[in-house]
Regions:
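N-terminal auxiliary segments of SAM/dcSAM-dependent transferases
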Residues: 1-60
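Conserved SAM-binding loop and adjacent beta-strand
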Residues: 69-82
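Helix-to-beta-strand junctions that scaffold the AdoMet/dcAdoMet cofactor pocket
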Residues: 92, 115-116, 193-197
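Conserved class I S-adenosyl-L-methionine
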Residues: 92-103
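Conserved SAM-binding loop of SAM-dependent methyltransferases across substrates and taxa
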Residues: 104-117, 191
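Short beta-strand element of Class I
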Residues: 118-122, 199
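S-adenosyl-L-methionine
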Residues: 124-182
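C-terminal substrate-binding/active-site "lid" region of AdoMet-derived donor-dependent transferases
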Residues: 186-210
Length: 210
């Protein structure tokens, strides 16, 4: 599954499914039991395919579809907010970006698309149950994009990870914090910024703190 190509299927109601084209019989939530490779490999982009009683349309695996079909555990940053943060921080190709609070990787997916193969994305997440989902989503995205940044992930809190960050990059162009508490994280992360670098804080809603 790790090396299987990606297919995107959409339903008439707009629901999106991201399918790994493995050559084996599997049960996929919302679709049913099928062999993804034999069922979908010869279906062209824009063509319809019937699986069970449902009709699906195959689309190219682009960022909007992959975000809609991503696995979720933590509440994700939406595309609108992700775009604003990327623009305000001036993030682009070749940048080194640190994101603390990987979660399900909604923000990281937008970052990866923007940064391209010349960028370097560093993610930090203290909760393994969240990072496992986020890293899987990033792995899926890496198979779909023509370019994907260098990626280093650190398990732990940003306040405790300064030395580990320095091991992979001496400094960073931008920092994004999506955490319940920001003051201590800002104090820990700010010294990593290059001159002219920028830092943003995304404040969680109450449900994320529960």
């Amino acid at each position: 599954m790790a090396d299987a190509p990606i297919a995107v299927l959409t339903e008439g109601n707009g629901r999106v499914h991201v399918v790994h084209l493995i050559d084996d019989s599997v049960k996929i939530k919302g679709i049913g039991v099928l062999n993804p490779y034999t069922t979908l490999n010869d279906v062209g982009m824009g063509e319809e395919v019937q699986i069970g009683s449902k009709i699906f349309t195959r689309l190219p695996p682009r960022l909007p579809e992959l975000v809609l079909g991503m696995k979720r555990r933590a509440q994700t940053i939406g595309s609108k907010d992700a775009g604003v943060l990327i623009a305000r921080l001036g993030i682009g190709a070749g940048d080194v970006v640190l994101e603390a609070g990987l979660g399900s990787a909604g923000q990281s997916m937008h970052l990866a698309r923007t940064m391209g193969s010349s960028g370097h994305l560093i993610t930090i997440e203290p909760r393994e149950e969240h990072s496992s989902v986020g890293l899987e989503n990033l792995s899926t995205l890496s198979k779909a994009l023509p370019e994907f940044p260098k990626h280093d992930h650190i398990d732990g809190r940003i306040e405790d990870s300064f030395d580990r960050i320095k091991e992979v990059s001496n400094d960073v162009d931008a920092i994004l914090l999506d955490l319940p508490e920001h003051p201590s994280a800002i104090q820990a992360a700010a010294p990593l910024l290059k001159i002219g670098g920028r830092l943003s804080c995304y404040c969680p809603v109450s449900s994320q703190l529960e």
